[in-house]
Regions:
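Conserved SGNH/GDSL esterase-like catalytic core that processes O-acyl groups on lipids
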Residues: 102-224, 228
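Mobile gating loops/cap/lid regions near enzyme active sites that modulate substrate access
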Residues: 95, 248-266, 285-288, 292-364
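Signal-peptide-cleavage-adjacent N-terminal segments of secreted and extracellular proteins
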Residues: 57-142, 361, 366-369, 373, ...
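Cleavable N-terminal signal peptides of Sec/SRP-targeted secreted and luminal proteins
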Residues: 1, 44, 48-68
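Extracytoplasmic, non-cytosolic globular domains
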Residues: 196-202, 207-308
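Structural recognition of the beta-strand scaffold that forms the well-ordered cores
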Residues: 77-81, 86-87, 146-151, 190-195, ...
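Intrinsically disordered, low-complexity terminal segments enriched in Ser/Thr
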Residues: 16, 20-34
């Protein structure tokens, strides 16, 4: 997905002033759909086991159902590769470690590009394990739940952000195996989560001055490398690998601001659609070649669109509910973004009154509620892991 850096502002066609937005405050409590449980002494995102659909629907939540999660033993480990949609702490110098990130969970900035839990947390919760340790903390934290190598702003190839691309992330994983941090048995019972490509497209269009017309060739290059990456992760010993399809990048508030958050930009969504179709085909071919369903796709593209459509319908029926294309957190004017402060340390951003009803946290990343809604759309696919 697109990383928040200053160059990305070149994507904007126009931007109306946000000086009139109010800087609302909210308490540091998790919404009803997610409860931060204590696991081995630390707070962790665990799906609640109660059904509260009626009350939450009245509050504007997208979907809430009772969730049982995976029934396998706690021996399972989760290894994560990709960008900020799945990063839980590796981007130490980023906005993920600055307010208001983490306001909902755990109540302070903790390395997630959201107000709370992200996709990695929910998949770990499904597996009934703690979210895996970020790679930068590999020498000081528990390793029994796996490792998160994902880094905000990274891509399949190098991007405009100084961070490890996916090849380097897999290199780090391989080194841990060589150091016998994880055994063959560890890996055989484990799951990998792979999600990347949005930052590659942003870099291609911005740094390399590419155009949408040039996309088909670039997409082919990305898919070819992703195929190599997936093969490599499997060859290192992991037998179940979840692969995220590309989210509809034309629906990001960073772009929808051009239409006053009224509609997604279809030319950009077409990029995502083509990428996802090609990636799905590659995954199917790999599974056929291996003779078993090693790879499972997580359809972020259609999950995002489904949730957005549902929330837009409810917003049209009840304007007091939040427009899903509008971010919860945004800068007070064009030169600022979520988390910006001036030279005096004063906030130059505003927050929505109810983050628990939002879909996007800021211009690129989802809120905790947004990720929960997407997770529920993906839930049936997780049973294949």
């Amino acid at each position: 997905m697109f990383h928040r850096d200053e160059n990305v502002k070149l994507w904007l066609v126009s931007h109306k002033s946000l000086d009139t937005c109010t800087q609302a405050t909210h308490t540091h409590t998790c919404p009803d759909c997610v409860i931060p449980h204590i696991l081995n002494g630390e707070a962790n995102c665990i799906i609640s086991n109660h059904s509260a659909s009626s009350s939450l629907h009245s509050k504007g939540y997208v979907i809430v159902v009772e969730v049982e999660g995976d029934k396998r033993s706690h021996e399972v480990k989760l290894f994560v590769f990709g960008d900020s949609y799945v990063d839980t702490g590796n981007s130490v110098n980023s906005a993920s470690y600055k307010p208001p990130s983490g306001d909902t969970f755990p109540g302070k900035p903790a390395g997630r590009f959201s107000d709370g839990c992200v996709l990695t947390d929910y998949i770990a919760s499904y597996l009934k394990i703690k979210s895996p340790t970020p790679y930068i903390f590999r020498n000081s934290s528990e390793l029994q739940y796996g490792m998160n190598f994902a880094h905000g702003g990274s891509g399949i190839f190098n991007t405009s952000v100084d961070g490890p691309n996916m090849t380097v992330q897999i290199d780090s994983f391989e080194n841990l195996i060589k150091e016998k941090v994880y055994t063959k048995a560890d890996l055989e019972s484990s799951v990998a989560l792979v999600n990347a490509a949005g930052n590659d497209y942003a870099t291609f269009l911005l740094r390399q001055h590419g155009s949408i017309q040039d996309m088909p060739v670039f997409t082919t290059i990305l898919i070819r490398q992703m195929s190599l990456n997936l093969r490599r992760i499997h060859s290192l010993g992991i037998n179940k690998i979840a692969v995220g399809l590309l989210e509809p990048i034309g629906c990001m508030p960073l772009l929808t601001v051009a239409s006053s958050y009224e509609k997604c930009l279809e030319p950009f969504n077409l990029i995502s659609q083509n990428h996802s179709q090609m990636l799905l085909q590659i995954v199917q071919e790999l599974n056929k070649e291996l003779g078993k369903p090693v790879f499972v796709t997580l359809d972020l593209y259609n999950s995002f669109l489904s949730v957005i459509s549902t929330m837009q319908k409810r917003h049209s029926e009840n304007p007091t509910l939040m427009n899903p294309l509008q971010p919860c957190c945004e800068g007070v004017s064009m030169e600022y973004s979520c988390g910006s402060v001036d030279e005096k340390g004063e906030k130059k951003y505003c927050l929505c009154k109810k983050p628990e009803l939002s879909f996007f946290w800021e211009g690129v990343h989802l809120s905790q509620n947004g990720w929960y809604a997407v997770y529920m759309m993906l839930y049936s696919s997780l049973s294949k892991l």
